[in-house]
A protein has these predicted regions:
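ABC-family ATPase nucleotide-binding domain "signature/switch" substructure
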Residues: 4, 21-119
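The feature encodes the conserved inter-subdomain "coupling" segment
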Residues: 11-19, 23, 27, 125
């Protein structure tokens, strides 16, 4: 457990009142959104599944915790098949394959580089996202 928590950058566990015996939840220590996500990612490491599905794993983190959660998510998905739902295009750009969906339908599929070069919907999304980051 300690190894899994360390691998997902959940260093806060050492500051809990009763260490790893601390009760978590409504009757115990309240986790903030980043801590809750780190704990969920540590649990994935403990289970060691072959396939991981993550839906907006960094959505609630805010800018301060996003980097830690992105690094932790990378650790969890390394050497596993992973389906990652992400609205942040910097996360999508790191994927082996990107599926672009509109109205519940896949409208484009390819690597980040292929999709940017294609000039379709992903290209428009990437240009708008990149402009907003400049």
């Amino acid at each position: 457990l300690v190894d899994a928590l360390e691998r997902v950058h959940a260093h806060w566990y050492g500051q809990l009142a009763d260490g790893l015996d601390t009760e978590i939840g409504s009757r115990g220590h309240q986790l903030d959104p980043v801590e809750a996500q780190q704990l969920a990612l540590a649990r994935i490491l403990l289970l060691d599944p072959k396939v991981v599905v993550m839906d907006e794993a960094t959505a609630e983190s805010g800018s301060a915790g996003a980097g830690d959660l992105e690094a932790a998510a990378e650790v969890v998905t390394r050497d596993r098949a992973a389906l990652v739902v992400a609205h942040r295009l910097d996360q999508a750009a790191q994927a082996d394959q990107v599926l672009v969906m509109e109205a519940g339908e896949v409208v484009e599929c390819g690597t980040h580089e292929e999709l940017v070069a294609r000039g379709g919907r992903y290209t428009d999304l990437w240009a708008a996202w990149s402009k907003g980051r400049a």
